[in-house]
Amino acid sequence: NYDNLLSFLNLLIILYSDIRSLYNGVLDIHLKGYINEIAKYKNYLSYDAAKKNLELVYSLVLKLQNNVMPKNILNNLFVNIF
């Protein structure tokens, strides 16, 4: 439900903040483009908008895994989402 999505988005915001601080010098411009989007997620009021943007975060995590993170480090977060 929507409350669960919001809780999950809050977790992702915290987690991504940690990732950004660790890999700030490594992330390329394309990945940095998602930072502002993640910051806006709390403002979405509809389930569809939240889910659409959650999919963008999932895409970002895949890019991070392929570029700067150990494989599978975040996969378990998404097993039950989609």
Residue ranges of predicted features:
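AAA+ P-loop NTPase domains with strong preference for DNA replication initiators
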Residues: 1-48, 52-66, 73-82
